[in-house]
């Protein structure tokens, strides 16, 4: 936003930081004129915009992002499969020992950045195949910084946030500054090992090694 405003001094772009559902809703209500999402618009949404007079409205991919899984530093288990992530979200794995026999971390607490966020939708659509999240211990806060703080202070929690939070060095709340947070490595295989599991770093997103990747649209 700052770069756009500097390059176009006669124009002004004002950013509103909100969840994906509300961003799309504001676009449909003409309260904003640009929304950045992690999904394509639906046919009904395109039709709504066309009926409002936006005949040439388009949605284009502009970037790729990954979902990062973060855990408390006290949790020694840092590799996980996509299959086990789905088991957690379906409520089939309720304790850390259901995935890692012998674990003493207790019940699994799942923390999302917002109940209406694109993170929740991705988990339902891409990990659970369109089915709802049924984990008995779900927490939804208001923003990613609160997810990080929750996981940092809760030994049995697993937080799910956008991987951009791992790389923004300007933001001191991001996990690269948190000594009590671990970033999990994720595997597509049946069993996760350090050799077949990847963290959501830019290169592993670029070469598709990291399993939990989403396209960002504008």
Regions found by a protein language model. Name each.
Residues 35, 41-44:
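Short helix C-cap/helix-to-loop transition motifs enriched in small/turn-promoting residues
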Residues 1-32, 39, 57-65, 70-218:
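Exported/periplasmic ABC-transporter solute-binding proteins
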Residues 45-52, 56-61:
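Signal peptide-directed extracytoplasmic domains
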């Amino acid at each position: 936003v700052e770069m756009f405003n500097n390059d176009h001094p006669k124009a002004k772009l004002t950013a509103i930081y909100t969840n994906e559902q509300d961003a799309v809703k504001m676009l449909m209500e003409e309260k904003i004129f640009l929304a950045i999402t992690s999904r394509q618009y639906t046919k009904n949404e395109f039709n709504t915009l066309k009926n409002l007079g936006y005949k040439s409205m388009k949605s284009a991919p502009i970037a790729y992002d990954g979902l990062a899984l973060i855990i408390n530093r006290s949790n020694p288990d840092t590799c996980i499969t996509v299959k086990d992530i789905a088991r957690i979200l379906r409520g089939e794995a309720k304790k850390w020992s259901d995935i890692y026999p012998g674990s003493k971390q207790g019940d699994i607490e799942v923390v999302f950045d917002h109940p209406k966020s694109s993170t929740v939708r991705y988990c339902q659509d891409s990990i659970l195949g369109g089915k709802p999240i049924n984990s008995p211990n779900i927490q939804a806060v208001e923003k990613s910084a609160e997810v990080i703080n929750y996981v940092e202070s809760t030994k049995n929690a697993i937080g799910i946030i956008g991987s951009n939070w791992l790389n923004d060095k300007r933001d001191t709340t991001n996990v690269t500054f948190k000594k009590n947070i671990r970033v999990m490595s994720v595997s597509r295989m049946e069993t996760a090992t350090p050799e077949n599991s990847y963290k959501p770093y830019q290169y592993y997103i670029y070469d598709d090694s990291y399993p939990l990747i989403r396209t960002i649209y504008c």
